[in-house]
């Protein structure tokens, strides 16, 4: 099975268009003010307009404020929601959209128990985590600690063209999620780095 690729933290329409042209399966928009990759609704609409049919648009939230998700869902017609904070299962399912729950790795929590707590999630994104911090850290973690049999298994955290082929070979995930690993600076995607990343994912699939 081919590993899907999500390019997350897109802040410019031209970066979304380049990612799609090069073969990305999904584009991620960050709705978290603390992130250097955060976008407002005006910016998000321009990015979504650059994404053609059959490429997913994912909205990433970290402990969203009341009404924040509804505004994004209604205004952007997001395909999937991604929750990266301490959101309860009831909140995640409330919006009646497919959702992916981030699983914090390295913070002491049991990932199997974490997955079991979200039985209606469409997928789980395993990312590095430090106690007391919110969201991902852009760092790798021990992939041997990922439990087996996880639906929609997505690996994130410290991925780049230099290591993603090995991660794909070792984990055989449904998808990989990359942000800083394809950037020239925070929030600015680099076309050449995206192309190399996608090529390395394909190489990992073939070996």
From Swiss-Prot:
InterPro entries registered for this protein in UniProt: Aldolase_TIM, PRAI_dom, RibuloseP-bd_barrel, TrpF_fam
For this protein, the Enzyme Commission number is 5.3.1.24
Instruction: Give the UniProt keywords, A-Z.
Output: Amino-acid biosynthesis, Aromatic amino acid biosynthesis, Isomerase, Tryptophan biosynthesis
Reaction(s) catalyzed by this protein? N-(5-phospho-beta-D-ribosyl)anthranilate = 1-(2-carboxyphenylamino)-1-deoxy-D-ribulose 5-phosphate
Q: Its annotated pathway?
A: Amino-acid biosynthesis; L-tryptophan biosynthesis; L-tryptophan from chorismate: step 3/5
The reply to whether Plastid figures as a keyword in the UniProt entry is no
Q: Name one GO biological process term.
A: L-tryptophan biosynthetic process
What SUPFAM superfamilies does this protein's entry cite?
A: Ribulose-phoshate binding barrel
EC class, as a word, reads isomerase
Q: Which GO terms describe its molecular function?
A: phosphoribosylanthranilate isomerase activity
The answer to whether UniProt assigns keyword Acyltransferase to this entry is: no
Protein name per Swiss-Prot or TrEMBL: N-(5'-phosphoribosyl)anthranilate isomerase
Q: Which organism is it from?
A: Halorhodospira halophila (strain DSM 244 / SL1) (Ectothiorhodospira halophila (strain DSM 244 / SL1))
Q: What is the name of the gene encoding this protein?
A: trpF
């Amino acid at each position: 099975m081919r590993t899907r690729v999500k390019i997350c933290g897109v802040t410019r329409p031209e970066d979304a268009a380049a990612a799609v042209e090069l073969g990305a399966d999904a584009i991620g928009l960050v709705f978290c003010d603390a992130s250097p990759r955060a976008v407002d609704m005006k910016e998000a609409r321009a990015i979504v307009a650059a994404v053609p049919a059959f490429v997913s648009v994912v909205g990433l939230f970290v402990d969203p404020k009341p009404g924040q998700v509804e505004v994004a869902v209604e205004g952007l017609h997001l395909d999937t929601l991604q929750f990266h904070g301490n959101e309860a299962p009831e909140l995640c399912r409330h919006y009646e959209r497919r959702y992916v729950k981030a699983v914090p790795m390295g913070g002491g929590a049991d990932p199997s128990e974490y997955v079991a707590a979200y039985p209606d999630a469409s997928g789980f994104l395993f990312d590095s985590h430090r106690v007391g911090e919110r969201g991902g850290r852009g760092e790798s973690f021990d992939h041997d600690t990922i439990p087996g049999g996880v639906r929609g298994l997505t690996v994130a955290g410290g991925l780049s063209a230099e290591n993603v082929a090995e991660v794909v070979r070792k984990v055989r995930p449904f998808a990989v999620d990359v942000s800083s690993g394809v950037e020239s600076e925070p929030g600015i995607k680099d076309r050449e780095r995206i192309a190399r990343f996608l090529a390395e994912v394909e190489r990992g699939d073939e070996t």
